[in-house]
Regions:
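His/Glu-rich zincin catalytic helix
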Residues: 1-82, 110, 120-123, 170, ...
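M16 family metallopeptidases and their MPP-like homologs
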Residues: 44-54, 80-128, 135-146, 174-199, ...
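Conserved phosphate-chemistry cores used by DNA topoisomerases
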Residues: 164-165, 201-202
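Extended serine/threonine-enriched, polar tracts that run as long, contiguous segments within proteins
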Residues: 206-209
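Aromatic-residue-lined binding/catalytic grooves and analogous aromatic/hydrophobic interfacial grooves
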Residues: 452
Length: 638
């Protein structure tokens, strides 16, 4: 093992106490691949390999490559290794993600043998993908005749990603975000749709997919991240054995450049499709968006998060309140907030349900709200509460359906992908300490809002107007494109289309040999599962159950009440009751004061209802109402 592990050089190690992890960073001596290991006593081990994927167009090459890389590899030549491994694995998580500038392949397991099985499958899928042309046709795009065996019938486009993106880009939020990216980043990858625009996906060739794979899916463009109680050395032995030893340096540096700053703010108008019936009333979206600092500076990143919280945390926040109460639109834009998923942060605000002629009024409303913060500042107590919220988000264990280790990985991945200090991105305690000192100066938040927003000319005001004819125009354009293609087809090309469709259909009926893939046996599964310890005691005339767990300085509280039998009308209103309950005032506090109070002492209060069967009689069910909250331990008695 030592000979293989020596291929890695330890670059950095540090303890991150708030997360109870030891951060270790290594570099592969041959390829330059980066390995970040987050050592923890948590037995749910997590692995992720992430690659910088920087498309220059909207053909969806990175997205389609994510799909096709999972259609079989050199050692595991089966059609769908992921689905087959789900049935042969004890994994707690398996997936793959495509972002605007990276693609990641994560998994998690609490069983060591299972973890190593999955590691072999993942490494082979990423670095030794088969990329069969037939898989490209299936996952990306292909031509078929409407009647598969009739070359006289019309041509149609098919493909998993092609159809997926047609659905995804039908959402107005997706179209808005894409329009913001195109407007703010005309010269970088954030100006194109990494998932793919349906009208551009069909321009991608198989050869272009292969070329992208050769340059982007190489170890010198990869970042490996591991978490848990398996040592870095063990991981590195496997990574070296099953992947890295087969590669030489590519010497091609892939990165995202910074966008050149605008000299003056711009205005852009775009359209989105809508039906005649939906178009009744004001349906225009008005948004303002800024490019801010880059994420490699942890203080700048956290300061920007703080400013976003100041402006948008709840209905009492100045910008949120302005957008909620204005008659310029029916509601704040779904894009409101700060995005830090790319190299450069983006801040967006605006309204929906408006009209094009109200843009100047919206700009005045937003800039006046920002100027109010610049002139009057923010109460120090509120700033402290918002910093508590940021700390809570950093410390929180679990939630969102993702393993704890994966959440930590994803929180530092954008910084790591852009060759920043991932340890600094994770260890926010020093930054919080610095910010707690900074907010004592009333001018801190005033100067921050001026620098990042008011005086920042890298800004776009976007008008998205509804167009009832656009959807039909796009359908007709696609039909015309297909008709033009059909006119040029030779008899041989027509037959190839029929043959490909038949081959894909036949492939779906072929059963791959599952024994090609590794598996766990019954002997590998522990006979006993961990049952958490608990204790009970009386509190306010009720029985309270306590579960001591390692929660990184947080407390999670629930009050669970059995519901009486509800009639049909009451049942219909229950969801609305749960939705509005936590936004109402409490006691002598109105709803704004209540929201400020929640921000000061917890991470929010949530209400939900559920139906559960009796532990001893599954035929007997009851309804329950649950009120839950989470917060820092220092606020337990609030």
């Amino acid at each position: 093992m030592n000979a293989d592990v020596s291929a890695f050089n330890l670059v950095k190690t540090t303890t991150i106490e708030s997360l109870n992890i030891q951060y270790e960073e290594y570099e592969h001596l041959t390829t330059g691949a980066r390995h970040i290991h987050l050592a923890s006593d948590n037995n749910e081990n997590v692995f992720m390999v992430a690659l910088r994927t920087v498309p220059t167009d909207s053909t969806g090459v990175a997205h389609i490559l994510e799909h096709t890389s999972l259609c079989g590899s050199k050692r595991f030549p089966v059609r769908d290794p992921f689905f087959m491994m789900i049935r042969r694995s004890l994994n707690t998580f398996m997936n793959a993600f495509t972002s605007s500038d990276w693609t990641a392949y994560p998994f998690a397991s609490q069983n060591k043998k299972d973890f190593n099985n999955l590691l072999e499958v993942y490494l082979d899928a990423v670095f030794f993908a088969r990329l069969d042309p037939l898989d490209f046709s299936q996952e990306g795009h292909r031509l078929e005749f409407e009647e598969p065996n009739n070359p006289d019938s019309d041509l149609v486009y098919k493909g998993v990603v092609f159809n997926e993106m047609k659905g995804a880009m039908s959402s107005i939020s997706s179209q808005l975000w894409q329009a913001v990216g195109e407007s703010l980043f005309p010269d970088t990858t954030y100006g194109v749709n990494s998932g793919g625009e349906p009208e551009n996906i069909t321009d991608l060739s198989y050869e272009q997919l292969q070329a992208f794979y050769q340059t982007h899916y190489h170890p010198d463009n990869a970042t490996f991240v591991t978490f848990g109680d398996i040592s870095a050395k063990e991981h590195q032995f496997k990574i070296q054995e099953f992947a890295l030893r087969h590669f030489a340096p590519l010497n091609k540096r892939i990165e995202v450049p910074l966008q050149d700053k605008f000299d003056n703010a711009i205005r852009v108008t775009k359209q989105f499709p809508i039906s005649e019936e939906e178009a009744k009333g004001d349906k225009t979206h008005l948004v303002m968006a800024w490019v801010l600092g880059n994420i490699r500076d942890p203080l700048e990143l956290m300061s920007t998060h703080l400013l976003s919280a100041v402006l948008f945390e709840n209905s009492a926040s100045p910008l949120q309140q302005a957008l909620e109460t204005t008659d310029l639109g029916t509601a704040p834009s779904p894009l409101c907030g700060m995005d830090d998923s790319g190299l450069e942060m983006v801040f967006v605000c605006g309204v929906e349900g408006s009209s094009e002629d109200k843009l100047e009024q919206l700009e005045a409303l937003v800039l006046n709200a920002l100027q109010g913060v610049a002139d009057n500042g923010v109460d120090t107590q509120r700033m402290t509460a918002l910093l508590d919220q940021l700390e809570l988000q950093q410390r929180e264990v679990g939630g969102g359906g993702y393993p704890y280790g994966l959440q930590i990985m994803l929180s530092c991945l954008p910084t790591a992908i852009h060759r920043g200090d991932a340890a600094a991105a994770l260890n926010i305690d020093p930054i919080l300490t610095q910010l707690r000192e900074s907010i004592q100066d009333p001018n801190f938040i005033k100067s921050l809002v001026k620098r990042l927003l008011i005086d920042n000319q890298h800004r776009v005001s976007l008008v998205m107007t509804p167009d009832t004819k656009l959807s039909q125009q796009r359908i007709e354009q696609e039909q015309q494109k297909l008709a033009a293609i059909k006119e040029t087809l030779t008899e041989e090309e027509k037959q190839n289309i029929i043959t490909t469709a038949a081959a894909l259909k036949e492939r779906q009926t072929v059963d791959d040999d599952p024994e090609i893939l590794p598996k766990v046996d019954l002997t590998d599964i522990p006979p006993v599962t961990d049952i958490p310890e608990f204790s009970e005691q009386k509190m306010a005339k009720r029985s309270a159950t306590f579960y001591p767990q390692g929660t990184n300085g947080l407390s999670y509280q629930q009050v669970i009440t059995q519901l009486p039998t509800l009639n049909e009308q009451q049942s219909a209103l229950l969801g609305i009751h749960n939705r509005v309950l936590t936004d109402l005032g409490v006691g002598s506090k109105d709803y704004l004061a209540t929201q400020n109070w929640q921000t000061q002492v917890c991470g929010g209060i949530n209400a939900q209802s559920s139906i559960r069967s009796d532990l001893n009689n599954e035929q007997q069910v009851s309804g329950y109402f649950t009120l839950s909250a989470k917060g820092l331990n220092i606020h337990n008695n609030a």
